[in-house]
Structure formats: structure tokens, C-alpha cells
């Protein structure tokens, strides 16, 4: 624990410096203390903890291991152990991981396909979705390796969690029909190959953190040329030929628009199965607009809208009302506050949007110059066209 900073770690440092004139170690990973769910130390007499054997039988060793490694306890901080926390890890990370593997195995067995992972050695996939999956799988290797090289165990798991989410909630969901097709055409073959490579890469990258599940997956995915265990494999090195930052930017841009669109639907209780006339995307970034235009079909399908409309100004869709922030301006203006409130209430939509974008607006109040910003002015929308569509501000 952290108490060893002045104990064993200190002793080693002093001895090494005195006897050998060099550091005892270059890096030191220190764990914190795992407390019971009530915040007290785990105690046999209090029985304030779950029996480890019962916890492993209930959740599996991987879930408990990942719960601890994906916490601040690996940064020498205290952590409260709870069955609920382990259950959350199981539901949000490990089950989705297994579901993606199960999806692949189920359909690969039905179609009697046996990917090798070599299809894209000399040529990239023709489908952008497959090329994107290969790219983010290589980025996964780079990000996790960088965190491990920095001895940052907690941060090393973040890219794995994100990748599992991307794999399930974007790639597989958007590719299902390709696997469902009856004919084994080139597109279907490439989809199997891309998913196979992604799963096998994920097994190798995540093996130090999720040793048992990744081993089970690997044993069924490996070919006759592979090592007999994932834990005997070299840690993967990214294939630079598969990395495509531009494609990742495009997909991230579309995902951002889709995510905000879904959020707006939830806000106004509009189920995704309910078709809408349009979605309005507000962006001033030329590159983002180009990407969104190219991926318009994907956006329409994801948000279940008939049309995608682009705007450069949010005030083309929404009208605003401005009010003075009396708490902030009152101290500055005193008796001029009432006059200022009237002037702020008369601000135009263009002036309000300028303030929302971080600009300052100078106004005269009885000869005194006052600069208005987002802290001094409270803004709220008073009208929007949500009846036939949804509007997404993209900056």
C-alpha cells in the first residue's frame, strides 16, 4: 500500500543509492486499500465483505479483476468494494464483449466460414465500415500500449471499454444485414474478416486485464498457425497501413451528430421508431459539413428521418430570449440594474447568439459602458421547430 512509500520503497531507494549509486527502480506501481462497502476496513469479525469464493462463483474472476484495475485503487487511492460495482462491470463491459464474440461465432458457424485474418494484408476493405473497424483496432493497440508503457493501468482500460462499445453499438449494429444475407458475396466475406481481426486483436490487447474470457475467445478464434494460448502471444503491434485518421474523424463526426439526435429524441420523448420529417444539423465547420453530407444516408437511417437539412446559424431554427443575471450584474451596476435589465431584454437574436458563442457585447447604460457576456446574460430558447423534426447544434 501507499504506507510503503516511507517503508519498503524508501528503504530500497536508500540502500541502492548508498551501496550502488543508482536507483533501485525506475517505476513503482502502488495499490491503495480495498475497503468494505461501508467504508471500513474489511474485517472477519464484522463480516462486512462478500466471501471471495462466492464473489468469483457469482461474477467470475475477470469481473472482479477488472473492477479493481478499472478504479483508482491502482493509483494508490482507497476504494470501496461492492457487489453492485462488480455487477456493473459485468453488465457494461464483459457481457457486451461476449455478445460481440457470440454474434461472430453464431453466424460464422451458420455460413461455415473460417476467416484467417490475412485477407487485408495486401488490399484494404472496400466497405468504409470495415476499414474504420481495422483502423480503430490498430488505434486500440497504440492507446493501450502507450498507457501500459507509462504504467497507467487505469487509463489503459479506457480504450478497451470504448472499443467494445464501438464494436457492438456501431459496427455490428450497422453491419447486421451484411451477415444476414443468404449469399456469400465479397462484401459478406470482408465483413467476417474485419470482425474476426477486430475480435482477435481485442483478445490480445485485453488479455492482461481480462485473462479468462479473452483466453476462451482466443481458443475458438485461433488458427493452426497461432500460439496455443493468448497468453503466449506477443503483445500486438499496430499495422500502420490500416490506420486511417481521416476515416476515424469522419465516423466520429457522424456518431456525434447521431448521438445528439438521439439525445434530443429522448428529451422530447420521441421514440426512434417514430419517423420524423427532418433533422437540422447546425455547423459552421466546412469539413464537418462535407463529412455529414457524405454520410447523409447513414444519419437518416440512424435517426429515422426523411431529410437532413444543414444550417450555419442556430438562430435560423431557434428564437432566444435574454434576461439579466441579477446576481452577477447587480454587484457591478447597483442602481443601474433595472435599466440594464430592460436593455438586455431587447437584445436581438444575432446579439444573443454572439454571446452564446463566447463573444462580448458592449452596451451603454446611462453613459456607462458595460460588457455583456454569457455570465451576465441568461439565455433561453422560446421557439423551435420540434413538431416536424429535430435540431442539432454542432459546435
Model-derived regions, located:
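Feature 926 captures the class I aminoacyl-tRNA synthetase adenylation module centered on the KMSKS loop
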Residues: 19-57, 61, 80-81, 85-395
Amino acid at each position: 500500500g501507499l504506507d510503503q512509500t516511507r517503508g519498503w520503497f524508501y528503504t530500497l531507494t536508500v540502500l541502492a543509492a548508498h551501496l550502488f549509486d543508482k536507483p533501485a527502480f525506475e517505476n513503482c506501481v502502488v495499490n491503495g486499500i480495498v475497503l468494505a462497502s461501508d467504508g471500513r476496513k474489511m474485517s472477519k469479525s464484522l463480516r462486512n465483505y462478500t466471501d471471495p469464493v462466492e464473489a468469483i462463483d457469482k461474477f467470475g474472476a475477470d469481473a472482479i479483476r477488472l473492477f479493481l484495475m478499472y478504479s483508482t485503487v491502482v493509483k494508490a487511492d482507497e476504494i470501496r468494494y461492492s457487489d453492485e460495482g462488480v455487477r456493473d462491470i459485468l453488465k457494461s463491459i464483459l457481457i457486451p464483449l461476449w455478445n460481440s464474440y457470440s454474434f461472430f461465432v453464431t453466424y460464422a458457424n451458420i455460413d461455415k466460414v473460417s476467416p484467417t485474418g490475412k485477407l487485408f494484408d495486401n488490399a484494404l476493405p472496400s466497405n468504409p465500415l470495415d476499414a474504420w473497424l481495422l483502423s480503430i483496432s490498430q488505434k486500440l493497440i497504440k492507446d493501450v500500449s502507450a498507457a501500459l508503457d507509462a504504467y497507467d493501468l487505469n487509463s489503459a482500460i479506457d480504450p478497451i471499454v470504448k472499443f467494445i462499445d464501438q464494436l457492438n453499438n456501431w459496427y455490428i449494429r450497422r453491419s447486421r444485414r451484411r451477415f444476414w444475407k443468404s449469399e456469400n458475396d465479397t462484401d459478406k466475406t470482408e465483413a467476417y474478416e474485419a470482425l474476426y481481426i477486430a475480435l482477435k486483436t481485442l483478445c490480445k490487447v485485453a488479455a492482461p486485464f481480462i485473462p479468462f474470457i479473452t483466453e476462451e475467445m482466443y481458443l475458438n478464434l485461433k488458427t493452426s498457425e497461432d500460439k496455443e494460448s493468448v497468453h503466449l502471444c506477443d503483445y500486438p503491434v499496430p499495422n500502420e497501413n490500416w490506420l486511417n485518421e481521416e476515416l476515424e474523424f469522419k465516423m466520429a463526426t457522424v456518431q456525434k451528430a447521431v448521438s445528439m439526435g438521439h439525445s434530443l429524441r429522448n428529451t422530447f420523448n420521441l421514440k426512434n421508431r417514430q419517423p420524423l420529417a427532418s433533422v437540422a444539423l447546425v455547423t459552421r465547420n466546412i469539413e464537418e459539413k462535407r463529412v455529414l453530407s457524405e454520410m447523409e444516408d447513414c444519419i437518416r437511417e440512424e435517426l429515422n428521418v426523411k431529410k437532413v437539412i444543414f444550417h450555419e446559424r442556430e438562430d435560423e431554427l431557434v428564437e432566444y430570449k435574454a434576461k439579466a443575471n441579477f446576481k452577477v450584474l447587480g454587484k457591478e451596476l447597483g442602481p443601474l440594474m433595472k435599466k440594464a435589465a430592460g436593455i438586455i431584454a431587447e437584445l436581438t437574436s444575432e446579439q444573443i447568439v454572439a454571446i452564446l458563442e463566447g463573444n462580448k457585447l458592449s452596451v451603454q447604460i446611462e453613459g456607462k459602458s458595460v460588457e455583456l457576456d454569457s455570465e451576465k446574460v441568461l439565455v433561453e430558447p422560446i421557439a423551435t421547430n420540434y413538431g416536424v423534426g429535430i435540431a442539432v447544434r454542432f459546435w
